[in-house]
Amino acid sequence: MADSSRGFVRDARGCRHWGPHGAAGLLLLRGPDLLLQRRSWRVHHGRTWSIPGGALDAGESPWDGARREFAEELGGLPVLRHLHTFVDDHGGWAYHTVVAEALEPFRPRRGDGEAAAHRWCSPAEVAGLRLHPGFAATWPDLAAGLDGLDGLDGLDGLGRRG
């Protein structure tokens, strides 16, 4: 039986995306820093930086999907506090960026091979990286949206402490 949660689909604008039920990723915060992963050369948009994430399964919530993908790609999952979910709606397809705070130390391990590397970085460093096109397009809005989230007061629109 075919897995209905996999494959490319087109949104209302004709853009191609992975996952007919949408996708979700986890933007993990540790104090002022966030965790990014460099995608393996073997995956779509390889060798770019993004957050762990992927296609949602049928009926799966963005929170559950983001945590599942994070654990698969980075070999584990810390205890989390959900802060917010940003939705990038493309019309017929959406990407959900789940923002969460790590409530315990977390050290990524080798996961399913989709991540070639990972790093903690300040929000100000993000724009200087070679980003996944979808993440690059939403990063300015995400960075601005981080300002004022519970526990993150004092970040300016670029995600820097003011």
Name what the model sees in each region.
Residues 1-25:
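Acidic, metal-coordinating catalytic segment for phosphate/diphosphate chemistry
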Residues 76-86:
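A short coil-to-beta-strand element that immediately follows conserved catalytic motifs
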Residues 29-30, 89:
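Generic beta-strand structural signal
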Residues 30-72:
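Conserved Nudix-box catalytic region and its N-terminal flanking loop in Nudix hydrolases
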Residues 84-113, 117-125, 138-142:
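Active-site-adjacent beta-strand/loop module that shapes the phosphate/pyrophosphate-binding cleft
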Residues 145-160:
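Compositionally biased, intrinsically disordered low-complexity segments enriched
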